[in-house]
Curated annotation (Swiss-Prot):
One of its GO terms (molecular function) is glycolipid mannosyltransferase activity. Its EC number is 2.4.1.-. It is a multi-pass membrane protein. One of its GO terms (cellular component) is endoplasmic reticulum membrane. Belongs to the PIGV family. GO terms for biological process: GPI anchor biosynthetic process. Mannosyltransferase involved in glycosylphosphatidylinositol-anchor biosynthesis. Transfers the second mannose to the glycosylphosphatidylinositol during GPI precursor assembly. Pfam families: Mannosyl_trans2. The chain crosses the membrane at residues 4-24, 115-135, 154-174, 225-245, 265-285, 316-336, 351-371, 373-393, 407-427. This is GPI mannosyltransferase 2. It comes from Debaryomyces hansenii (strain ATCC 36239 / CBS 767 / BCRC 21394 / JCM 1990 / NBRC 0083 / IGC 2968). InterPro entries: PIG-V/Gpi18. Coiled coil: none annotated. It is an enzyme of class 2 (transferase). The gene is GPI18.
Length: 428
């Protein structure tokens, strides 16, 4: 519990610094948010009257902090927290996240109360992810002799580094990154505690999963967590690769029929989520909508990504997007170094499924998606944070210095990014 209290203290300190920066960021480059602020002026006045604080203090908090979180995608989220869907593309806009906030019976009918509820839930999820990462690190590396003596410190440092994640202010705003990461880390943790590492990867093993029934349940729950994470952010579909990996290990290498079926059921939950989300939009729009309804695989998600956001192979590779590639470059470099570190320098076989997912994410971001979002969406995977933490606990002065410089960069990036976000400047 002592380590958890340390994590909480660092978390509160860092969030406080972020909010101070937001408060003192002078003006917004894009003033379109003022239209929303003016539209919900009465909602703001209602909040001011409900708070038991002097008016000037309450108004200062709302005007200088909360108003500055009405930027970029938070504009869409905050609208959906309160209002019904108006446009087609909103159906694929992190559908489960905004529905969760909308369904919570707090602040109903008030724009500002729902916005602040979204921010509160986002920060709770961020803290929860830090704590899960602490226990996940213990579980993932406890069988590795390379980390036995420093496992507690390694786990704590990994969680602290996650607090200063390059995702930064997006884990504080009412974005979907924090809840997505929470359920993603939970899924990896539940999967990891379910696997019998004493026998795993041995060809003649009779046990792929631990024998007690509770571990069969936790393994199935790991698939449930991925399904929820996918409903929050589509990129979590990549986590399904873990269960395909397990199917290979359980069925082909270990020849365990029972646990092979469990891997199919656990991973199959993600498939059910995909079918359900696509069927829902198809039932609403098709066949009258035409266009994407007539595709071989009718998917509003795929259509919206390509039609509204120009997502596609090499679509983002242009001179105008060079700055966006530069924004993502540190995350790309750290991810590639993580692969090298955990395959060559400190090989940990348990990490292979996570590295596969991370590799797929990297390829997708660089070649298909808006590459700058890699900085924030990569927060649903722990590999990069483990790499920096591993450097930190190393006996090598060079490695330790590298880790220190990386953390300094993360802190500096967070401070700059927070100010840019509050000023409605890229990257988004």
């Amino acid at each position: 519990m002592k380590d958890i209290s340390v994590i909480v203290k660092y978390f509160v300190l860092f969030k406080s610094i972020q909010l101070i920066i937001v408060y003192f960021t002078p003006v917004q480059f894009d003033t379109s948010s003022q239209l929303i602020i003016e539209k919900y002026r009465n909602d703001k006045l209602q909040v001011l009257s409900d708070w038991k604080l002097p008016f000037q203090i309450s108004d200062s908090i709302l005007s200088n902090i909360i108003d500055k979180f009405i930027t970029w995608d938070a504009v869409y989220f905050s609208d959906l927290f309160l209002n019904d869907i108006k446009y087609e593309h909103q159906f694929v806009f992190c559908p489960l996240w905004w529905r969760i906030i909308k369904w919570i019976p707090i602040g109903e009918g008030n724009y500002y109360k729902k916005l602040m509820l979204g921010m509160l839930c986002s920060n709770i999820c961020h803290l929860g992810t830090c704590i899960i990462l602490y226990y996940l690190t213990f579980e993932m590396f406890k069988t590795s002799s390379l980390f036995t003596k420093t496992l507690r410190e390694f786990s704590l440092i990994s969680s602290i580094i996650y607090i200063i994640s390059p995702a930064g202010i997006f884990l504080t705003a009412s974005y979907s990154e924090s809840p997505c990461a929470l359920f993603s880390m939970a899924s990896i943790y539940l999967r990891e505690i379910s696997i019998n590492r004493e026998n795993f990867n041995h060809l003649n093993s009779k046990n792929s999963l631990k024998t007690h029934w509770i571990y069969k349940v936790t393994y199935l729950l790991s698939g449930t967590m991925v399904s929820i994470a996918y409903g929050i952010r589509g990129n979590c579909l990549l986590l399904g690769a873990m269960f395909l990996f397990d199917l290979y290990e359980f069925g082909i290498r270990n020849r365990d029929i029972t646990d092979s079926i469990l891997s199919l059921v656990s991973g199959g939950q993600i498939f059910v989520s995909i079918i359900a989300l696509n069927w829902y939009t198809y039932a609403i729009f098709c066949p009258a909508r035409g266009e994407w309804c007539q595709s071989w695989i009718p998917s509003l998600f795929s259509y919206a990504q390509s039609h509204y956001w120009n997502v596609g192979f090499f679509n983002y590779w242009s001179l105008a997007n060079i700055p966006n590639f530069l924004f993502a470059l540190p995350t790309i470099v750290l991810t590639l170094q993580s692969f090298k570190h955990f395959t060559e320098e400190k090989p940990v076989k348990n990490l292979l499924p996570v590295m596969i997912v991370n590799g797929m994410l990297l390829v997708g971001a660089v070649f298909w998606w808006h590459v700058q979002i890699l900085t924030r969406i990569s927060s649903f995977l722990p590999l990069m944070y483990w790499f920096v933490a591993s450097m930190w606990i190393s006996d090598s002065p060079t490695y330790k210095r590298y880790s220190e410089n990386t953390m300094k960069f993360m802190i500096g990036w967070n401070l700059i990014q927070t100010s840019m976000f509050a000023a409605f400047l890229p990257p988004a």
